[in-house]
């Protein structure tokens, strides 16, 4: 029986709808399954304070504390991505470290980032993508080594680091000045870096104007969320405490709740960058996570 023109159009339209739905489902499925190939965790410094209450106001005044500091090298099919660059490699040449905050903090770099990249068989020029949780010097201390990489940064953070008063936010321009000429992707919120759901930048403002965290999907390890300085150690996270050195308290609390919900929905591990006890359990090069 021959279909009428209207009937044929309806059939074609229905087929198109099915095709769109199938394509959408296929894309969603690919996004759910996509993972990075591996991720290295580097020791990018440590900082010792004589008073941890600077980071947990009113709690444990006068108690000494050691903060870990990690960088993460991610291997994706499209290339290498570095998340945070830690303290400056120059500190590794200082036997007594570098003193900051009027003597309240001593920063040390046991190994250079460059030497740890080499253990993974990677040079700084091999890194195609770079992103920082924020631009305080313990996270962006080696930023100038990655001038060939595409920079992923929240627009609010970009405006702050290259604006007229970067020191107001605790930024030190000399540590990242060379990034001015990098190819840059300015973000206004969450962003799927590779378009497949394997690496997602999560906007978490508060600690700085454009602070961000990172969700990484690994085949065996599962989903990991890298905190940046959303929180500094487990007890602060559990109590939702905000350090005194912080840009916007309300934004930080809101960002904490956002990530806490994401941890639940993604069944994710939450890795707190400066939590020494947690960091001590992480594999180091040449070992990696996959």
Regions found by a protein language model. Give the residues of each.
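Active-site metal-binding loops of divalent metal-dependent hydrolases
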Residues: 44-45, 85-88, 135, 156, ...
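Active-site metal-binding motif and surrounding structural segment of the metallo-beta-lactamase
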Residues: 93-153
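Bacterial N-terminal signal peptides that target proteins for export
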Residues: 1-13
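Metallo-beta-lactamase
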Residues: 18-20, 24-126, 154-203, 221-228, 251-267, ...
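Short Gly/Pro-enriched turn/cap motifs at secondary-structure boundaries
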Residues: 61-65, 202-207
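Cap/insert and terminal regions of metallo-dependent hydrolase folds
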Residues: 89, 101-115, 213-215, 220-290
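Short, electropositive alpha-helical surface patch
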Residues: 132, 137-143, 210, 280-290
């Amino acid at each position: 029986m021959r279909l009428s023109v209207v009937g044929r159009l309806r059939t074609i339209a229905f087929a198109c709808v099915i095709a769109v739905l199938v394509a959408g489902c296929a894309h969603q499925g690919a996004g759910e399954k996509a993972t990075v190939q591996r991720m290295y965790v580097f020791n990018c410094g440590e900082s010792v304070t004589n008073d941890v209450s600077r980071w947990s106001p009113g709690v444990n005044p006068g108690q000494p504390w050691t903060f870990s500091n990690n960088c993460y090298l991610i291997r994706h099919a499209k290339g290498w991505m570095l998340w945070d660059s830690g303290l400056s490699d120059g500190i590794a040449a200082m036997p007594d470290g570098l003193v900051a905050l009027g003597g309240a903090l001593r920063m040390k770099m046991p190994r250079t980032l460059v030497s740890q990249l080499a253990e993974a068989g990677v040079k700084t020029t091999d890194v195609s993508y770079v992103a920082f949780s924020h631009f305080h010097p313990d996270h962006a201390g080696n930023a100038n080594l990655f001038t060939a990489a595409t920079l992923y940064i929240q627009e609010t953070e970009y405006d702050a680091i290259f604006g007229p008063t970067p020191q107001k936010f605790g930024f030190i321009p000399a540590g990242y000045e060379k990034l001015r000429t990098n190819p840059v992707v300015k973000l206004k919120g969450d962003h799927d870096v590779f378009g497949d759901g394997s690496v997602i930048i999560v906007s978490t403002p508060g600690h700085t104007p454009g602070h961000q965290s990172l969700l990484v999907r690994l085949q065996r390890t599962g989903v990991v969320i890298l905190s940046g300085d959303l929180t500094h150690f487990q007890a602060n996270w559990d109590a939702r405490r905000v350090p005194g050195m912080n840009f916007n308290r309300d934004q930080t609390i809101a960002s904490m709740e956002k990530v806490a919900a994401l941890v639940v929905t993604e069944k994710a591990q939450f890795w707190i960058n400066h939590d020494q006890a947690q960091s001590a359990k992480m594999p180091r090069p040449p070992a990696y996570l996959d």
